[in-house]
Amino acid sequence: RHFDWDGRLAPTNLATDAEILAVASVVDEVGVGVIQVGGDQALGKQIAEVSGRPVFYGNITQQAVAPDRWRSRLAEAEEMLRRGHRAYQFVMPRPGDLRYTLKTAQHFDALPSWKTVMLMSLDDRKEAFRDPATRAKLHFEAVETPLNPENAGEFSRRWDLQFVFQPALAKNENLTGKSIAQIAEEQGKDVLDVFLDLALEEDLETEFERREVNSDEEAMSVLLNSPHTIIGQSDGGAHVVFRTDYSYSTYLLSHWVRDRGIMSLEEAIRKLTFIPASLFGLLDRGLVRPGMVA
């Protein structure tokens, strides 16, 4: 949900679908402009149908919680374009790595006991993490309970994809780059005990990293090369506590072009410049041509 500078909900949070579709239906009369829709894919497709303008209605990711869901999302994008609608989904070239500490983590919020603990003061939170009864509840939710893959925001239970990114204490530097599952196996401990014990030892300053999104490079190669997707989807620094996405263009050029060779340099430049410029109606840029913006 988004708010304006005065703390009021943005109009799009309050408008009905009918009102949004009514506004979208006259955008094409102006002859310029694009529409972005976040979250509601069904509404995004309806807007594409009534507006006649380019619509960006989400992003396709490869996710550990549902490893093959991207295939149906890509087929959906292809079908929309076949029907003549300029409806596109973004693909982020970077892995969706999120770095966090147990002072700031949000990705346990769909688990009720975790959410309760994470809303506590830091001192109370540390006491809760130490409490055996509370830890048993946290273990039940984050280790024992099966994942619901339909809940996109739910913690994956993939402790092999939760890594120690930066320990706070020099004595724990040897854990850098190891997954919680790997450390648990090496120490003969439960994954949750490893996770919480390390965080508590370092006063919740341990920086972890979750690598659950866009980690399958074969799937990503298909998505990035698809003519039905648009490369992009930086958050512009909105979640800088957890990640910074502004490097997506250089990551495409360095990792995917130079290191992996999944497309030519020329094609990558076209996908980063000419294609988005054309879709956004910026017709004076995107090509190296006399009179165009450099």
Annotate each PLM feature.
Residues H2-V27, V37-G261:
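Active-site neighborhoods of metal-dependent hydrolases
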Residues V30:
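Catalytic histidine neighborhood in serine/cysteine hydrolases
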Residues G33-I35:
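Conserved divalent-metal-coordinating catalytic cores
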Residues T206-N214, M220, L265-I269, A277-A294:
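Acidic, glycine-enriched loop/beta-strand segments at the rims
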Residues L252-S278:
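Gly/His-enriched, cation/cofactor- and phosphate-binding structural elements
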